[in-house]
Amino acid sequence: EISACLVGSEMCIRDSTGGASNLTYLLRYPTRDLILRRPPAGTKAKGAHDMRREHDIQRALAPVFPAVAPMIAFCDDAGVIGSDFYVMERLDGIILRKNIPAELGLGEAEVRALCTAAIDQLVALHSIDVAGTELERFGKGEGYVKRQVDGWSARYRKARTHGVRHGTGSFEKVMAWLDEHQPHDVGNCLIHNDFRFDNLVLAHDDPTRVIGVLDWEMATLGDPLMDLGGALAYWVQADDDRIMRGSRRQPTHAPGMLTRDEVWQYYAHASGRAISPKDQL
């Protein structure tokens, strides 16, 4: 199947913009465009850059989530290009970066429609019933929130520099607060874990319509509100302070975009999930 895609006709290979972890290449043929994804070279963290898993999640999603790119094939023969890789169809559309291009001509109403369409994709993903499907194997079950808090605290302690004083003013206070205030899981569903505008593909003929969701390398089974919270962590709005605005990587500040409060309220209404004050911390 891989050979049928990659052999037999003239091809142009280009490094594709996007993908901050795994490497993404555009394979341009006379009659079609494909995308090849492979891990970076060098030493990799255990369990990271699992190309088979990333491929299999998207393949399993295809029957129940139309916004995933069709998978072509996975290859674990390192003799082909030096690593595992997979090939998928290219979703031809618009990917937003830091700002909305002026040439799209989107007014405030269209920007709001784009924003709610993005949240609708997250709601749709979290609404998938994974029980009894292939998707059920991509997670560890209940306890996702605790695993994240415990896991990241442990990584911090292993990575900190020896000989540096820790205590007052260190990250220990933050970790203690997170441990004390972590909410109970509200559900167990497939979560994307990197849901932001530069991982969405918009239709050329209607940029308020989402036709694709990309970069599934961190997807897993977990708490949907953790996925929502992760998305909001990137959500820099127009009235944020200078430091926050300086970290903005997507056009969430644009006139018409929902604020963070409006995002979680819209999500709660669309998903039917109650979000408590503790969940908002």
Predicted segments — roles?
Residues 139-140, 274-281:
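All-alpha amphipathic helical-bundle segments outside canonical DNA-binding/catalytic cores
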Residues 213-219:
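Activation of the activation-loop gatekeeper triad in protein kinase-fold domains
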Residues 200-202:
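Hydrophobic residue at the +6 position relative to the catalytic HRD Asp in the kinase catalytic loop
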Residues 226-272:
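Active-site activation/catalytic loop segments of kinase-like enzymes and analogous catalytic loops
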Residues 14-190, 204-208:
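ATP-binding pocket architecture of kinase catalytic cores
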Residues 190-192, 197:
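Catalytic-loop of the protein kinase fold
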Residues 2-12:
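Short, small-residue-biased leader/transition segments that mark boundaries at the very start
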